Amino acid sequence: MPFVTIQFLEGRSDDQKKALVSEVTDVVSKNLKAPKENIHVILEEMKKTDYGVGGVRKSDI
């Protein structure tokens, strides 16, 4: 029962997230030979104010 967690910054559309879940499921199923119904994809959308790189928040760039 594979679990895939994807963290990304806010701003993606519902259609983009739907496509991501579908395509990641396909790739994991193919490579691990796991049934699609056993694959869990967790999307963790982060606010730009809650994420920083090099000491700078993404919201401040």
Curated annotation (Swiss-Prot):
Source domain of life: Bacteria
Name of the protein described by the UniProt record: Probable tautomerase lin2709
Entry EC number(s): 5.3.2.-
Range of residues in the leader sequence: none
MF terms (GO), sorted A to Z: isomerase activity
Active-site residues per Swiss-Prot or TrEMBL entry: 2 (proton acceptor)
PANTHER family: 2-HYDROXYMUCONATE TAUTOMERASE, TAUTOMERASE-RELATED
Keywords noted in UniProt: Isomerase
Sequence similarity: Belongs to the 4-oxalocrotonate tautomerase family.
InterPro entries: 4-OT, 4-OT-like_dom, Tautomerase/MIF_sf
